[in-house]
Amino acid sequence: MPTLESNGATLFYQVTGEGSPIIFTHGASWNHLQWNKQVDYFKDHYKVIVWDVRGHGYSSLPEGPVDSENFSADLIALMNHLNLETAVICGLSMGGHISLQTAVRYPERVKGLILIGTPCSNTFNLYEKIFVPINRISSKLIPMKISGKIQAKMLSRFNPENYHYITEAFSMLSHDKWNRVWSAVTRMESKKDLHKVKCPTLLLIGDQDNMTNHQQTYMHQHIPDSEIKTIANAHHGTNLDNPDAVNQAIFDFIKKIS
């Protein structure tokens, strides 16, 4: 099982195919298996890299509070480990925010940026300022099995197979690790840094994603060289709900910037 060490954590990763590199970063509570349909689609023409963010899947999490700055540092450590000067990076939700912060903090390393259902802030509006702290508390009180089932049911409307994957991904997380990671994730803020993104950017949003859609127009307006596309028949698990449309959008974008 390929791993690397980064900032006190052992990180799992997987490389498939040869060619220009694309790195996919998964959403919170999920893992690298989220991208199976993308790996299968792109592996014949690109070097496809997936990994488990610290505290998720097969990656470890050091004791103590989690510093969200380590997320983007880990992604760069992965690139260094694989001797990649630049890459196209893609992420969904938390993984998108990690990718966004990587493009802001390490602009010379990012050739293109793909953000799927991605927030730039956890205090974007009054609702989030009230709801996110409540969500942090509730995540400490609700058992992981129940949290997993709630999320799986909500995100299985367009693809029933999502239910099994999401509950399995949740089962790999301990309650302690999840709460420490979630505390860090929900404090990530990039709203004031969007203008610092220097690479071409594609924003993808599911037409039924009511979790992050309110931020997408703002991000498109403030990321200089960006375009936005809506993915039909998709909720927040956009690449799981409509992988064909997501794959085509990513393929077209990469071809355009190559």
Roles of regions detected by a PLM:
Residues F124-L126, L141-H195:
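Conserved alpha/beta-hydrolase catalytic His-Asp/Glu region
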Residues A9-L61:
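Conserved HGGG/HGGXW glycine-rich cap/lid loop of the alpha/beta-hydrolase fold
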Residues T201-A234:
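Conserved loop-alpha-helix segment in the C-terminal half of the alpha/beta-hydrolase fold
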Residues A234-P243, N247:
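Catalytic histidine-centered segment of alpha/beta-hydrolase-like enzymes
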